């Protein structure tokens, strides 16, 4: 399993819209990472509940070795890269 970055967002969330641009930029740069986006209002997979998402935007990173990292709030490109590459 490759490193996976999961972004939890909502379409009505202003900071999520801004963060989406940063997410797309970093996604293009880190091609070895799987990027997943989950709209919390349409999440039928239960991921938002599993990762205890209570505010958006919220980012969860799952590493190959099973370790995880998470942060709530809008991140800039450098912060997102640091979260993913911890």
Language-model regions: role of each:
Residues 1-9:
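Short active-site neighborhood of thiol/selenol oxidoreductases, capturing the structured segment around
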Residues 2, 30-33, 86:
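Short glycine/proline-enriched coil/turn segments at helix->beta-strand junctions
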Residues 55, 60-86:
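Non-catalytic, surface beta->alpha helical segment in thiol-disulfide oxidoreductase systems
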């Amino acid at each position: 399993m490759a490193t996976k970055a999961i972004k939890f967002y909502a379409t009505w969330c202003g900071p999520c819209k801004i963060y989406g641009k940063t997410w797309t930029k970093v996604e293009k740069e880190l091609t070895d990472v799987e990027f997943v986006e989950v709209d919390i209002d349409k999440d039928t997979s239960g991921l938002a509940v599993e990762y205890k998402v209570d505010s958006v935007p919220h980012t969860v990173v799952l590493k190959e070795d099973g370790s995880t990292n998470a942060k709530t709030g809008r991140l800039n490109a450098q912060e997102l890269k640091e979260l993913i590459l911890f």
